[in-house]
Amino acid sequence: MRTRMTSTPLDKIRNFSIVAHIDHGKSTLSDRLIQTTGGLTAREMSAQVLDNMDIEKERGITIKAQTVRLTYKAADGETYILNLMDTPGHVDFAYEVSRSLAACEGSILVVDASQGVEAQTLANVYQAIDNNHEIVPVLNKVDLPAADVDRVKAQIEDVIGLDASDAVECSAKTGVGIPEVLEAIVTRLPPPKGDPNAPLKALLVDAWYDAYLGVVVLVRIFDGSLKAGQQVRMMQTGATHRIDKVGVFTPKATDVEYLGPGEVGFFTASIKEVADAAVGDTITDEKKPTAEALKGFKEVVPVVFCGLFPVDAADFEDLRAAVGKLRLNDASFTYEMESSAALGFGFRCGFLGLLHLEIIQERLSREFDLDLIATAPSVVYKIKLRNGDEIELHNPADLPDVMQIEEIAEPWIKATIFTPDDYLGGVIKLCQDRRGMQRELSYVGSRAMVVYDLPLNEVVFDFYDRLKSISKGYASFDYQLEDYRAGDLVKMSILVNSEPVDALSMLVHRSRAESRGRGMCEKMKELIPQHMFVIPIQAAIGGRIIARETVRALRKDVTAKCYGGDASRKKKLLEKQKEGKKRMRQFGKVEIPQEAFIAALKMDED
C-alpha cells in the first residue's frame, strides 16, 4: 500500500537511537513510545515489539538493530516524524551499534535510576559522542523504591561528563514521563541535513533475510532519493541491484513511493544472502553516483573461533543446512568444514565474541533441534615464522612445527569493569590471575571502575561467569580489542593411552599450562570408564609430559579356579594375564564417551 507522495521536510524529522546497558529498560521504553504515538493498536502491542527473536526476549537483549517510524503531534501543534533506531547493547555487536548511531543525529541515554551507570552504558555513550550526537539523559524506573535520582544524576556528570541537571525522569513500565521524553526528542535533538537534488547517498544500517522477499535492507538516506525501479550500486562490494520496493516500518512494514533525505526505511532488491549487503556500506545511484562514500565502513572480522560437531554423526547434513541458514541472516558469522579424529565431521565457526557464540549455539539447538558439541573457544593468533612469513592460526591443532616459529602473538583487550567496592579485591585478583595489567582504578561513589589490559585468550574461557560469581552478579564488564602482543605461548596436547586427542589441544601461556593440564587430566580420569588395561591420561607440551593421571584396569580373578595346590600354577596364570594386558594395551582402543569431551571442554578453573 502506498501511503504518501511527498517527502517530509527535514526540520520535521528526528532520527534518534536509545543507548543503555542491558536491563535498563531500553526495549520497554521503545514499546511505550510506539504505544503513545499510536504506532500499534493496544491489541497488536506485544511486550518488546522490536525484539523479534525469542532469544532476544528471553535473555532481555537486543541482537539485531531494528527501526520504527513514529508520527508525533508535538506541543507546538506541528507533526513530526520520529525515526527510532533500536540498537543492540552488547559489546559483541559494537559495530552494528556504531552503524545505527551513524544513521542518527541524537541519542537518548537511558540509565536505570536504581542501578546507575554501568560498563556498557559507558561504551555506547562514547560511541554516540564520537558520532557528534546530541545526548538527552533519561532516568528510567523512577517508580522503584530503590531509585535514587540525585545520586544517578551526579554519577552521569562524574563518569560521563554530561550535564544531567535537566535529565528527563520517567518510568517506562507505568508510562510516567513518556510525553516529556517525546517533547525532549523534538525540542532538544537536531533535525537531519541533506540535499534532495544531490546524487543518492545512503547508509546501509542493517540487513536481514526474509523467506519471501529475500534480503531486506535497512537504509538511512543522506542525499538524493530512493524509489522502486532505481538501479543502485553498493560502493564497497561493487554489486548493482534493481530496487523492487521501498517502505518504512511503523513498526509494520508499509510501502511508500520513495524515501527522501533524512529518512530511514527499507528496500528489497532480490539480493540472495545478507553477506552481499555489508553493514556500513554506502548505496548510490548507478547512473549518477555520489563522489565519495560515507566514512566508517569496516569489514566485520570474527574474533572467537570454536568447532561445532553433531553429537550424532548422522546429523551432519542437518548441521550443514542450519549453519547455511544462519549465515543468510548474520554476515558476521563464518564457518568452514573441519574433521576431527575424535569427533568426526563438523564446522569451525567464527564469532564476534562470546555472547554471539552462545546465541548461535542456542539458535542451532532451539530452531534446528540439533545436539551439538562445541570445542574449547580459541582466538586468532598471529604467528611469525623463521622464514619471515606471517600466518593466522584459527585452530590450535594446526600449529606449525615449533622449530619454524619465531614468535606467537595473541590479541589483547582493554576491559572496563564496574563493581561495588566490596568485591573489588576479588575482581582484581581474577584479573591478575588472568595475566592482566592494571591501567587505572577510580571510584564513583561506592562503585569502583577498573580498567585492565587482558589477553583475550584468558577471557574467552569463563572470565565473565567467574566475574559474575565473584561479585554476586553486580559487576558489569565491557571490552574493546586493543592490539596483538607476543607472548610465551605453548601448545598443550592431551594424550589418552599415548594417542593425542585433537579436539582437546589448546594454546596456553607457559605459566598456566601445568595447572590447566592437571585440571584437564583429572576431569578426564573421572569420566573415562575403566577398560581391561591401564589407561594413562597425559598433558604434554611438545615431548614433555607436564601432568598425568591413570585410569586403573578392570581385573579378572584368573586364579579363582585354583583350589590350594602349587603356587607356581597361580604365578603362571597371572603372568599369562599380564602378557595379555600388555598386548591389549598396545592394540586396544580407548572409547572416550561424549560426556567426557563436553565436561573437559566446559572445565571451570578454580
From Swiss-Prot:
Principal subcellular localisation of the protein: membrane
Molecular function terms from GO: GTP binding; GTPase activity; guanosine tetraphosphate binding; ribosome binding; translation elongation factor activity
Membrane topology: Peripheral membrane protein
Cysteine-cysteine disulfides: none
Catalysed reactions, semicolon-separated: GTP + H2O = GDP + phosphate + H(+)
GO annotation, cellular component aspect: plasma membrane
Name of the top EC class for this enzyme: hydrolase
Stored Pfam families: EFG_C, GTP_EFTU, GTP_EFTU_D2, LepA_C
GO biological process: positive regulation of translation
Subcellular location: Cell inner membrane
EC number: 3.6.5.n1
Alphabetical list of SMART domains matching this protein: EFG_C
tr-type G domain location: 11-193
Amino acids binding GTP: D23, H24, G25, K26, S27, T28, N140, K141, V142, D143
Protein family: Belongs to the TRAFAC class translation factor GTPase superfamily. Classic translation factor GTPase family. LepA subfamily.
Name of the protein this chain belongs to: Elongation factor 4
